[in-house]
Swiss-Prot record:
Family affiliation: Belongs to the OspA lipoprotein family.
Record membrane topology: Lipid-anchor
Main localization, broad class: membrane
S-diacylglycerol cysteine: lipidated positions: 17
Subcellular location: Cell outer membrane; Cell surface
Protein name: Outer surface protein A
Signal peptide: 1-16
Classification via Gene3D superfamilies: 3.90.930.1, C1 set domains (antibody constant domain-like)
Any Gene Ontology CC annotation: cell surface
Top-level taxon in the UniProt lineage: Bacteria
Record keywords, A-Z: Cell outer membrane, Lipoprotein, Membrane, Palmitate, Plasmid, Signal
Amino acid sequence: MKKYLLGIGLILALIACKQNVSSLDEKNSVSVDLPGEMNVLVSKEKNKDGKYDLIATVDKLELKGTSDKNNGSGVLEGVKADKSKVKLTISDDLGQTTLEVFKEDGKTLVSKKVTSKDKSSTEEKFNEKGEVSEKIITRADGTRLEYTEIKSDGSGKAKEVLKSYVLEGTLTAEKTTLVVKEGTVTLSKNISKSGEVSVELNDTDSSAATKKTAAWNSGTSTLTITVNSKKTKDLVFTKENTITVQQYDSNGTKLEGSAVEITKLDEIKNALK
């Protein structure tokens, strides 16, 4: 009888260990905040395999995993009702999370989102061939670049969503080009793959007296517009992802007044007139 009871006790203990990852609560776990407004529950004690159990809920789906560390880092997985598989990878320093959704085979990506501690993120959606078809890059300040209809050659549509207005353009394998047109003038903001910004201006006006030209200073991120050999205004594309405009005096020799932040798309167009 004693051996029987010991056997039952051992079985119950093993079951408890196996179910440990499914029964984490505030008493036996610690909640750790993660980038992307998520959190993970980490068991206070190691399981039978000498690892810490992890549980996180993402879009109402419970993900489970284990880790050698008790700080919340590790890999968690789950399966949706449609049998697609979800994988959450938490970096060792907790500074980044990677959320991936795969097809039923567990290999073909459907979507992927990488979120950093500073709230910046990169989100990608994939087509049936496993190629990126849509992409959203969100900066720490909340402004973002949105790419849609991405083709296999890397081309597609582009949109930069700033604080209070939107710039639209195109994507190529080399760069993003965002365009604003006003009359004969076209302003192009180019963003390289590495994130470097350059701006250029083209004017099809045939009259030399009114035709606009511009020079870009990469050191100050300033586009200086000139008409009839006189500087008329500076457009500054700041690191804070804003654009300011400041006028030159009538002689075109020095700036006057203060730089004013552009808050509407029409204000950019007015600056191009």
